[in-house]
Amino acid sequence: MSKFTEEELTYLKTQRIGRLATVNERGEPQIAPVGFRYNEELDTIDIGGHHLAESQKFRNITRNGLAAFVVDDVVPPWQPRCLEIRGQAQALSEGGESVLAQFSSALIRLTPKRIISWDTSTKRSHSARNV
């Protein structure tokens, strides 16, 4: 059983870009737009990119393994929607092509520990929970 609700999963599957937040060795935050996919088998968010293994975000994850990930958009007339996922992340040397064929082999895998969502479906709703 997934940690995500059906509405959250449906929303995730309609989005292509998210923002990954990590912290560097000086304790400074870094955020970057990234490509991703929901990994149904592991119930994780898998993040890929070009030259991912050489990136600051990959080094940050290798060092401390903490990350937050946000997917958001706005639908007319003005309805912001958002899914924030906080959790434990792994920097892996293989699997990036599963996100998008053009990506490098490196992969960041985020396992949710806290999920915050609002208005991810047609119903106006807000949810925050530890998972």
Task: Describe the role of every protein-language-model region.
Residues 1-19:
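Short, basic/aromatic recognition patches
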Residues 12, 60-61, 110:
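A generic structural signal for nonpolar/aromatic side chains embedded in well-ordered alpha-helices
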Residues 16-50, 69:
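Short beta-strand segments
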Residues 36, 87-89, 112:
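A structural signal for short, well-ordered beta-strand segments
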Residues 42-44, 66, 88, 114:
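Structural motif
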Residues 51-105:
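Short, structured beta-strand-loop surface elements
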Residues 80, 93-131:
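C-terminal edge-of-domain segments
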